Amino acid sequence: MSLKAISAKDAASLDKDLMEMGGWSLDQLMELAGLSVSQAGMWSIYRLHPPSAGKNVLVVCGPGNNGGDGLVAARHLAQYGYTPSVYYPKEGKNELYQRLKTQLHNLSVPFVPDFTEALKSADFLVDAIFGFSFGGPLREPFPSIISQIESSSVPVLSVDAPSSWDIQSGPPKEGPGSKFMPKALISLTAPKPCVKYYRGRHFVGGRFLTKSIVEKYGLNCPDYPGIDQIVEVGVDAEGRL
């Protein structure tokens, strides 16, 4: 099944429609997104890498909603039996993010101050730094962080787009992120155009869209198995979903 990719502008408009006309709150959308991220992490690592084989998941969060999705995912991963830690160098100012932090503190999920040291002990990494609204350029500390992720052998799950990638044109031609190819990618709601440059395990999470939203944006949602919130869709050698 071929899936339609949506632009950053349409993705932002879709989120606005969900909240203004659909009755959804930002909290709800972030919870569903974070749940999808955690399930993609489970699919990517649990069947081949259960908690008994290595529990340490490093969740790297940016200052926006993509980072909030990462905070939610970290909570779910803790409940699944993993040992997540969070690197959150530039915290978002929205009060929602502070509540998510409190939830993690109550589960004794640590917020680590040193990314380089945390990466050394990570078995898996969730890249929740930048999402569909990223427009560049990268600002510190993120160029250094992305360079370290890029050169590490730790498997990575990126949220909505590999951080540093342009949503339309994919990886930068040079500098941090130019060779960044995470092991897995979870597209939230619908794939973004940059996915045609991606090679790896590709998941979609958006099992909450109404018929009216699907029709308005011309989406063709995949069939989700059972009660799963995500589905693996892949990308072929020609960049087609």
Swiss-Prot record:
Q: Which InterPro entries match?
A: YjeF_N_dom, YjeF_N_dom_sf, YJEFN_prot_NAXE-like
Task: Kindly state one GO CC term assigned in the UniProt record.
Answer: mitochondrion
The GO terms describing molecular function are: metal ion binding; NAD(P)HX epimerase activity; nucleotide binding
Question: What protein name applies here?
Answer: NAD(P)H-hydrate epimerase
- What is the similarity comment for this entry? Belongs to the NnrE/AIBP family.
Keyword terms, alphabetized: Cytoplasm, Isomerase, Metal-binding, Mitochondrion, NAD, NADP, Nucleotide-binding, Potassium
Q: Which residues bind K(+)?
A: N66, D127, S163
Report domain YjeF N-terminal positions.
11-221
Where's it mainly located? cytoplasm
Q: Which cofactor does this sequence's record say it needs? A: K(+)
Q: What does this protein do?
A: Catalyzes the epimerization of the S- and R-forms of NAD(P)HX, a damaged form of NAD(P)H that is a result of enzymatic or heat-dependent hydration. This is a prerequisite for the S-specific NAD(P)H-hydrate dehydratase to allow the repair of both epimers of NAD(P)HX.
| Enzyme superclass (EC) | isomerase
| Binding, (6S)-NADPHX | N65, N66, G67, G68, D69, G131, F132, S133, F134, G135, G136, P137, D160
Q: Which organism is it from?
A: Aspergillus fumigatus (strain ATCC MYA-4609 / CBS 101355 / FGSC A1100 / Af293) (Neosartorya fumigata)
Where in or outside the cell? Answer: Cytoplasm; Mitochondrion
- Assigned EC number: 5.1.99.6
Per its record, the protein catalyses: (6R)-NADHX = (6S)-NADHX; (6R)-NADPHX = (6S)-NADPHX
What does the entry comment about cofactor binding?
Binds 1 potassium ion per subunit.
What HAMAP family does this protein's entry cite?
A: NADHX_epimerase
